[in-house]
Amino acid sequence: MVSLKIQKRLAASVMKCGKGKVWLDPNESGDISMANSRQNIRKLVKDGFIIRKPTKIHSRSRARALNEAKRKGRHSGYGKRKGTREARLPTKILWMRRMRVLRRFLSKYRESKKIDRHMYHDMYMKVKGNVFKNKRVLMESIHKMKAEKAREKTLADQFEAKRIKNKASRERKFARREERLAQGPGGGETTTPAGAPQQPEVTKKKSKK
C-alpha cells in the first residue's frame, strides 16, 4: 500500500480544511501518489480524484427543545441542581440587574419630562436604598407622588386665592370705615344754601323752683 500522507497534507492545504476532511479515491492511488506538488493536487481535485468531505451536521433540535422547557421551569428540580443557590445565581448579579432596570426606567421618565430632576434624584436614592422591589412598584410610587404634589399645589392655590379674597375684603372694610370717620359722627356736615335766612338760635331758660 502506497503512503499518501504527503498528498493528503497538500490537499488539505489547497482546499483549506483539515486532513480529516480530505477523501482520496482508493482506485486512483497510483495517480495520486505521483502528485508531489500543489499544482498536481489542484488538477486531481478538479478531476474529482480528491474530494473535500461535507460538513457533518449536528442537530440542535433536541437542545433547543430542552432549553425551551427549562425556560418554562421544567428539569430544574432538586435532583437537577448542582451547586448552592448563591453559586447558581449570585445575589450580586440579581442586585445589579434590578438596579440597571430601575435606573434605566428613571432615566427614560426624566428624558420624557414625566418627572423633574428633583423627583429623579429622590427616586434614585430610594432605588439605591432598596425601597422598590420591581419596576411596577416604582411606577406606582411615582404616580402616587405626582398625584400628591398636584393635590398639594391645588390646596396651596385655593389657600392663596382665599387669602387674597380676605385681604381685599379687609381693605374694602377699612376703606369704608375711614370714609365714615372722615364724614364725622353726624353722618356728614349739612351745608345751607347761599342767600337763605339763618334761623336764630333759641335758648331755653331754666325754670327756678
Curated annotation (Swiss-Prot):
InterPro entries named among the record's database cross-references: 60S_ribosomal_eL19_sf (IPR035970), Ribosomal_eL19 (IPR039547), Ribosomal_eL19_CS (IPR023638), Ribosomal_eL19_dom (IPR000196), Ribosomal_eL19_dom1 (IPR015972), Ribosomal_eL19_euk (IPR033935)
Gene Ontology MF, one: mRNA binding
Keyword Ribosomal protein: yes
GO biological process: translation
Any single Pfam family the record assigns to this protein: Ribosomal_L19e_C
Basic residues bias: start-end ranges: 71-83
SUPFAM superfamilies reported in the protein's UniProt record: Ribosomal protein L19 (L19e)
Sequence ranges of Basic and acidic residues compositional bias: 161-181
Record keywords, A-Z: Ribonucleoprotein, Ribosomal protein
Region ranges (Disordered): 60-84, 161-209
GO cellular component: cytosol; cytosolic large ribosomal subunit
Keyword Lipid metabolism among UniProt keywords: no
Family: Belongs to the eukaryotic ribosomal protein eL19 family.
HAMAP family associated with the record: Ribosomal_eL19 (MF_01475)
Protein name: Large ribosomal subunit protein eL19z
Organism from which the protein derives: Arabidopsis thaliana
Gene name as annotated: RPL19B
